[in-house]
Amino acid sequence: MALFSSCKMYDNLPEGDDKPALYLTKEMGKLTDLLTGNANGWRLVLLPGSYQYGGINIAFKFHKGGAVESYSEDLDEVIHSSYRIYNTAGIRLTFDTRNPALGRYAEPRNTLLQGLEGDFEFTFGDVSADQDTIQLIGAYSRNKMMLVRLKEDAESYINKVKDIRNAVYGKALATTTIGGEEVKMSVFGLIRQLQVKVGSAEPRLIPINFSTEGIEVIGADDLIDDSDASQGKVGQIGTEILRQIKVVKDGSTYHALSPSGQKIAIQSTDYDFTKSK
């Protein structure tokens, strides 16, 4: 549903006692209650720009009064900062004090005046009927993302993501078969891209994010080139759309699983993809 009613943004706003200003104030209060009402927190996959850095896992614990704790797969420390929900051309969530979990992708750096094309401010979209997911739209990137209610503690969740990330960071996956094609894959952890070489074709990069289950392909069903559908979809490998590669702990080590369940060894590579980790 759109926010908490059938009214979205400024369409068909009620009148009288529920005139627009009061309506929006009530909606902002409901969103605040929703965010602060889950002690475990909320998880987000941050999607900068055109997914050139893949997706970054961040978990938040929102508190009454505007305090927020942020846990990022990039950072070892917990970030304590503040947030605010306000109205400007839609109800927005902004992280209004320094927050390195978001800022490292949103703040200008050196010659990159646009930063890494990430967001620290978002417009609220739809809230699911069960109130377990909240759509966010990046104010800068315009990318659609999801806040998802956590069923476990935020720090515990991020630590599990880190375990998966560390297991495959800068590693190659043994040759396997997907969609009837022989496939070689390597994980570029720093920029969160999966290098995929199908048969004799040139390698290509697929944007990914890590999860507690493995490697997730971002925008698997999107066209590689919107102007040329013949190039196929982002996750297209032979007859199959690659959406996920599961990563499973096996004693003290890990292995991957193909979409068909085939076991794939995780191997060291001839190149150090982990430089500047």
Placement of each model-derived feature along the sequence:
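Acidic-enriched, low-complexity/disordered segments with a strong bias for Aspartate over Glutamate
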Residues: 11, 15-18, 33, 54, ...
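N-terminal accessory/assembly segment that mediates macromolecular interactions
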Residues: 61, 67-123, 203-261
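Preference for solvent-exposed, low-hydrophobicity sequence contexts
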Residues: 150-277
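C-terminal motif of bacterial Sec signal peptides marking the signal peptidase cleavage site
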Residues: 3-6
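Acidic/polar, low-complexity intrinsically disordered N-terminal segments immediately downstream
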Residues: 8-92, 156-171
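Short linear motifs in intrinsically disordered
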Residues: 30-34, 57-62, 121-127, 184-185, ...
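Long, acidic/polar, low-complexity amphipathic helices and coiled-coil-like
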Residues: 67-192
